[in-house]
Design a protein with these regions (language model features):
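A charged N-terminal "starter" segment
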Residues: 1-123, 128-141
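Conserved anion-binding
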Residues: 118, 127-175
Length: 175
């Protein structure tokens, strides 16, 4: 579906009544072009029927453009980060630490400390080793466990995330 802020007039593409051709003459190509109004409208459409206590988190690995992150902050979204760099970037964008979830394997001790010091919403624990590192922190962060259900999915083997030998999550027994 094409967002309504992108329209064709006389065979030319416009974004919010600005000629994309004119933009391409002013900045080097190729480039990415986003509509802030479309992003805001999408956020509102997605969250409009949710309870105010629901936390919608944008996955920063999808696109970590600072201006896009700032737009999502302005819309009240939270963030799912998978590295210390992403965590620092959403903080720079103005994110509320209480709306940040830190997921992903291989979190370093310094990344865990930063997340704990910022008092983020939650750190998703992916392994017993990671849990030991969290226990050794001076501050005690809020945590959740990513449980690997040991289930096969109808998908390509390279992108399966629920089998016992998957690097993501931990067994229910280990948790």
């Amino acid at each position: 579906m094409r967002p309504s802020n992108f329209i064709f007039k006389e065979g030319r593409l416009f974004l919010e009544n600005i000629s994309v051709e004119k933009i391409a003459q002013e900045i080097p190509t190729p480039f990415y072009l986003y509509s802030e109004a479309s992003l805001e409208a999408s956020c509102k459409a997605y969250t409009s029927n949710m309870d105010s206590s629901d936390l919608v988190c944008y996955s920063v690995k999808a696109n970590n453009n600072l201006n896009i992150l700032k737009t999502f902050v302005s819309q009240g979204l939270g963030f799912d980060v998978v590295s210390g760099g992403e965590l620092q970037k959403v903080i720079k964008a103005g994110a509320d630490p209480k709306k940040i979830v830190f997921s992903g394997v291989g979190k370093t001790t310094s990344e865990l400390k930063l997340a704990s010091d910022l008092e983020i919403y939650s750190i998703n624990v992916e392994s017993a080793f990671e849990l030991k590192n969290i226990i050794n922190l001076e501050t005690k962060p809020r945590i959740s466990f990513r449980i690997n259900p040991d289930m096969e999915g109808d998908t390509h083997p390279y992108i399966e995330t629920g089998k016992a030998d998957c690097k993501f999550g931990m067994s229910e027994k280990d948790a």
